[in-house]
A protein has these predicted regions:
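Hinge/lid segment of periplasmic solute-binding proteins
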Residues: 99-152, 205-206, 295-297, 362
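Extracytoplasmic "Venus flytrap"/periplasmic binding protein-like
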Residues: 57-127, 162-171, 267, 275, ...
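Short, low-complexity disordered leader/linker segments with a strong preference
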Residues: 1-37, 60, 118, 424-432
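Long, aromatic- and glycine/proline-rich binding clefts that accommodate carbohydrate-like moieties
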Residues: 126-132, 297-298, 346-396, 400, ...
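Short, solvent-exposed loop/beta-turn-alpha elements that line the ligand-binding surface or hinge
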Residues: 113-127, 197, 214-240, 288-289, ...
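Glycine-centered hinge/linker elements that transmit conformational signals in sensory
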Residues: 181-182, 225-257
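Extracytoplasmic/periplasmic solute-binding protein
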Residues: 139-147, 152, 177-230
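Extracytoplasmic/periplasmic substrate-recognition and gating elements
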Residues: 56, 60, 140, 164, ...
Length: 432
């Protein structure tokens, strides 16, 4: 999930020496007053608002339960969870990222198959559930109840497009470069990049774009071969995609300070920039600033018209396997599958991962329509389905490709070297 991953993966590599206190391991009666503790690492994003409002609604239905939502620092969140699991002093429920993150930490999580009624699980988008299950197969049972469906996505200013004479949203590299030329001539920054909006530090996060470059290069059924190494990171197709990406800056499609610009979100909100690549967690911010001028587009990082979109349940809540309040924790997870919960999540500007629900935000609904009406293939977030060490290396190397500081081959070779250094159990021909 989004831009915290590289720091979190690094911090979680070593357990803290001592565990955090005041967790869910304290004793408590299931019939008397119960305090249910939830840890989250959302910071100030819309997800935090949604979770707090879910907690309030749950408390209203369960008068004996107090839900204590604890905001933990994002930079060492998973190290805190691991340390607390050792001493069993952690939370009852915890925000957990999906994909390989879930499988990495499943030793202290509860598989929810048979714990939550099948009818409740059936209300959840099955594509969301599978990415929280062993072998990414929902039949094996999820470890996470997803909070929302997330998109890595492009946003564009319709008024800027109209003024510049861009009559159609670009769908491939050639059309994108042509649109950039018109937007620049009209006085706009075509695409804004930078490190603004990152919860942790001033770092450019390349995996939104990298996901779309790999969508342009490979079918979703072949993405596992990036994990296994059957498709080398240094493949000609990958190098060609990164070479095109680097042209965005060299051809004047972006700001010159792509790695260090801190107000890139402000450039888009103010109308100075015509496009940016971001995610659903900022949709409400953009619609509040730009109203009907803002719309979503699929980043067209492909030689032929792009046919895939990143549609992925990036996080949700897991129950720890040492909680002493499992009855109440499971009730909360069941509540997350209801239509009432979906309304709360939608009200926070997010997309509920519940079957049959929609979103009141028109830009979020546009993203859903890419799959449901335009029949684009839904892809996961690439940084959730390749190894954390490879993600870390890519986060260090890939930004310099866009900046023109290093070649695509150099960055991809570093990623390939990192992959080759992993034990064979971490790069098999199937997911763990």
């Amino acid at each position: 999930m989004r831009h915290w991953k590289v720091l979190a993966a690094t911090a979680a590599a070593a357990l803290l020496a001592t565990a955090c206190s005041s967790g869910g391991g304290s004793s408590g009666s299931t019939s008397g007053p119960v305090t249910l503790t939830i840890w989250e690492n959302y910071g100030t994003e819309q997800n935090a608002t949604a979770l707090k409002n879910l907690a309030k609604a749950f408390e209203a239905q369960h008068k004996n339960v107090t839900v204590n939502v604890v905001s933990q620092p994002a930079d060492n969140y998973f190290a805190l969870l691991q340390a607390a699991a050792v001493s069993k002093t952690g939370p009852d429920l915890a925000v957990m990222w999906t994909g390989l993150f879930t499988l990495q930490y499943k030793e202290f999580l509860t598989n929810l198959k048979g714990k939550i009624p099948a009818a409740d699980l059936a209300r959840i988008d099955p594509d969301a559930l599978k990415w929280t299950s062993d072998q990414f197969n929902a039949a094996n049972g999820p470890y996470v109840i997803p909070l929302e469906n997330q998109f890595y996505i492009g946003f564009y200013n319709k008024a800027a497009f109209a003024k510049a004479g861009v009559t159609a949203v670009p769908t491939d590299w050639t059309q994108l470069f042509a649109a950039c030329k018109k937007l620049k001539a009209a006085g706009y920054m075509p695409l804004t990049y930078g490190n603004g909006g990152q919860p942790l530090g001033a770092e450019f996060y390349p995996w939104y774009d990298m996901s779309y470059m790999m969508i342009g290069a490979h079918a979703v059924t072949n993405w596992q071969q990036l994990y296994s190494g059957q498709i080398p990171w240094t493949s000609a197709a990958n190098q060609a995609q990164l070479a095109q990406w680097a042209k965005l800056k060299s051809n004047g499609c972006t700001n010159s300070d792509v790695l260090t610009k801190t107000n890139n979100l402000g450039d888009f909100e103010s109308g100075k920039a015509a496009m940016m690549v971001d995610g659903t967690w900022d949709t409400q911010k953009f619609t509040s600033a730009l109203g009907s001028k803002v719309a979503a587009f699929v980043p067209p990082f492909s030689d032929s018209p792009i046919k895939g979109v990143v549609d992925f349940a990036g996080d949700g809540l897991s129950m720890t396997n040492y909680t002493q309040h499992s009855a109440q924790a499971l009730q909360f997870l069941e509540f997350m599958t209801t239509s009432q919960a979906a309304k709360i999540i939608n009200a926070a500007g997010l997309i509920p991962a519940i079957n049959g629900t929609s979103t009141s935000n028109p830009v979020n609904q546009q993203m859903l329509n890419f799959v449901s009406q335009d029949h684009m293939t839904a892809y996961p977030m690439l940084d959730n389905v390749v190894q954390g060490n490879v993600v870390n290396t890519g986060s260090k190397e890939l930004p310099s490709v866009l900046n023109g500081s290093i070649s695509p081959k150099s960055a991809l070779s570093s990623m390939q070297t990192t992959l080759g250094q992993l034990p064979s159990t971490q790069r098999g021909t199937s997911y763990p």
